[in-house]
């Protein structure tokens, strides 16, 4: 009882110093946690990727679409279990500040390929039968207060116009790594609109998602798919889903390196603050420590007291 009481009394010998030291350490730890969370969030999509899925896109750039007819040829490649496709939509909900990902998908094949998107059978069926239907992640629905049956208006950017979707389902993630901030709707709805306004852009998609029979065949299947469309008007680049996600991370690699560097600097700051506090405490109490040693207290006890008070 004597030692804790002694430590407590000496802690408040300099109340302001103790308060500022504690506050500095709390801020530093909170900053480190926030910075590491940002870095982890950047890699979340890649970490949640499946080894059994490939992504096929234009070899020139992701902004160039691929003909939908490629789907049938990809299905015929040995080792391919199924094929789906998706388009980035890029709509605006009310204002530019309300950003969230939106994808036009082939619902039957896409949902079958992503079992980690957990949705009830009733909501899945309602989504499949409603051409203007959409599903969103739980976090996104909670953020905007949406519930099943609501109407979601989006202002198109890549695909101009006002788009209205009926919320038919809210999906959860099979685990915490699954993104729950995305909206999915019918690719056919988007394609029909494009064919009316820009006929030459119809029946094209941004990416194909390829499900493998055996993940070990990823490299072989990727090479075969790209060889199939070599020397065509729209050559392809096929890579694992994780590699595809990491390609987006690579675009902002300099920012990530800077954030990681700052997070480690924060650790150094924490250690410097603690070392400075310990040094100040020890210097101020040399006489007291000498007296305690003269009274018979050992060096280990005095050292422990310094650490506890710091």
Regions found by a protein language model. Give the residues of each.
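Start (N-cap) of specific transmembrane helices in multi-pass transporter permeases
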Residues: 6, 10, 24, 280-288, ...
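Peri-transmembrane interface segments
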Residues: 38, 42, 217-271, 281-284, ...
């Amino acid at each position: 009882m004597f030692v804790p009481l002694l430590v407590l009394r000496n802690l408040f010998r300099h109340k302001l110093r103790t308060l500022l030291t504690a506050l500095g350490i709390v801020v530093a730890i909170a900053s480190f946690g926030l910075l590491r969370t940002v870095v982890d969030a950047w890699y979340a999509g890649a970490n949640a990727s499946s080894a059994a899925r490939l992504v096929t896109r234009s070899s020139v750039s992701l902004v160039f679409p691929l003909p939908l007819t490629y789907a049938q040829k990809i299905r015929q490649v040995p080792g391919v279990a199924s094929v789906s496709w998706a388009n980035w939509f890029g709509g605006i909900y009310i204002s530019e500040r309300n950003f969230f990902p939106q994808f036009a998908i082939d619902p039957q094949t896409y949902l079958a390929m992503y079992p980690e998107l957990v949705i009830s059978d009733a909501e899945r069926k309602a989504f499949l039968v409603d051409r203007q239907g959409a599903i969103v992640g739980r976090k996104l629905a909670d953020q905007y207060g949406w519930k099943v049956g609501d109407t979601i208006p989006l202002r198109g950017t890549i695909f101009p116009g006002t788009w209205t979707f009926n919320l038919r389902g809210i999906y959860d993630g099979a685990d915490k790594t699954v993104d729950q901030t995305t909206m999915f709707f019918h690719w056919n709805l988007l394609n029909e609109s494009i064919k009316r306004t820009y006929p030459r852009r119809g029946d094209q998609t941004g990416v194909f998602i390829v499900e493998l029979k055996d993940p070990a065949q990823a490299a072989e299947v990727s090479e075969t798919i790209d060889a199939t469309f070599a020397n065509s008007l729209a050559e392809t680049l096929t890579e694992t889903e994780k590699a595809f996600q990491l390609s987006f991370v690579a675009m902002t690699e300099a920012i990530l390196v800077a954030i990681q560097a700052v997070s480690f600097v924060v650790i150094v700051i924490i250690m410097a603050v603690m070392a400075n506090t310990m040094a100040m405490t020890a210097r101020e109490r040399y006489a007291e420590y000498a007296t305690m040693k003269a009274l018979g207290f050992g060096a280990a006890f005095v050292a422990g007291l310094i650490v506890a008070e710091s």
